[in-house]
Amino acid sequence: GLRGSLPKEYQGRIVIKVSKAKTDELVNSCKEQAALELQYGEPWIVFDRDRVVRFDEIISQARQEGVHVGWSNPCIEIWFDAYFGKMHSYQDSVACCREFRATFEKKTGQEYQKANRQIYDLLNRYGDESGAIQIAENRFQQFRRDGFCKPSEMCPCTTVQHLVDEIKKKTSG
């Protein structure tokens, strides 16, 4: 996964921890982890809109409390889609997942499984991460130029590229 793609000297210094928490508890859970382990100097949460009612409020709370946010609206597959050169205009998670599954299988020759621990490796092998970052950032900035401020109104869109870009900057030294 992402950790394995980091240069060896950074694999022990950048901590990537996946935690199960209810969406409403993500910020507090992240802050608790950061307080327990001092190496979490720059805490992030990553989550999808899906059917999260308090999507905007959770993002706002995180920012106010010093937690960075990588969000996807409607789902993480919109970010994955960008690896293959496009960010389609899906408005709901079901359509987004269904269409990404078809694209993924066409591009990789493999079945898409949401919980696949190798997804990052596969996206990088068959797709273009730098292109994905640019596509996602262009979409995000276009929504902002168009006057959209709330992440829930920015669909399809993601800010996961900010996390990936930050990791790349920290490890390309």
Task: Label every PLM stretch briefly.
Residues 2-16, 30-44, 49-173:
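C-terminal accessory helical subdomains adjacent to catalytic cores in phosphodiester-
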